[in-house]
Amino acid sequence: MKATEGVFDDSVVYVTKQGTQVGVQGGRIVVRDLNDESAPSQTHESPTESSQSGVEVLATFPREQVDTVNVFGGVNFTTPFLARASTDGIVLNYFSQHGQYRGSFVPEQNTIAEVRRAQYALSTAAELALAKSMIAAKIRNARTVLGRKGVRGTDTLRELGEKVTHVNSKDELRGVEGDAAARYFSRLDETLADGWTFETRTTRPPEDHINSLLSLTYVFMKNEVLSALRQLNLDPFLGVFHADRHGRPSLALDLLEEFRPAFCDTFVTRLINRGTITHDDFRRDNHLNDDVFSTYAEKFDSYMEEAFTHPYFDYRVTRREAIRQQTILLRKAITGELDNYHALEFDH
């Protein structure tokens, strides 16, 4: 979890400690140790919860500065907290202990008919134009990430990026994206420190430690995108590139594409190359050990709060702010306030 005190913007709270309880006390969100028998009951009916002596408080956050709470595994909520979350528009996202997305609680106030109506009315051509912008950015960012690590000979990625402009269907675009991903991942091994190797992308389950970290980071970043989409009243399940499937947040996966190389993969290689995570930190099933998972979540949150110069707006933003900005641009493109969607691209 974040530090117990401090002012923060667009705040996302991560609760990873097993056996904890999220409640409210006055104007603050309070995370308590549920294993303490003196902790307040989850079925408490009052709109707030009184302080109790002897209860270990693990963290507190100003309620008005929190817009998203992410919980992992065995974490419970009090009834008063859920009532406050509904009133305050706080989105709750549920994950397994090791980061698999399970579901969300989204207050009704987060839906606006006008925005959804425009989204549902998008033509196939408009959807393809949005998807092409996202995938072109993903391919360019992949080439940039490799170049920053000294990897040369990536002209094929450049050519595939240029090919995106000329595709005429989503299926054709998926083919180009798949070719680019294969080319990119075939060179990712060259960006890793000694003692680490990467051969090919594998999922469900990931077959090695690198793939495990990539999958976990994509889940975390997808949740950042999900949160932004919901806060801006877009339907995350109606995509423009990924095919619709029951329970799959296709639009979140679409927008995630441009962040995969520049944000996700860069974070994973940083953890590895700096020695923050080692092979000893994994279990036999390639999941992170519980204590290391908490460290991972803290590092990810800090990473999202790091600032960089936005290549399009030319001012400093955090990665979390950048995702929100891209979501705003996407919404404006969907509603017709912008003629085109400007994806996040890094040239160097």
Question: Where are each of the predicted segments found?
Answer:
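A surface-exposed, charged beta-strand/loop segment in the N-terminal or early-internal portion
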Residues: 65-144
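Active-site helix-to-loop segments that bind/position phosphate- or nucleotide-bearing substrates
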Residues: 1-35, 42-48, 60, 111-348
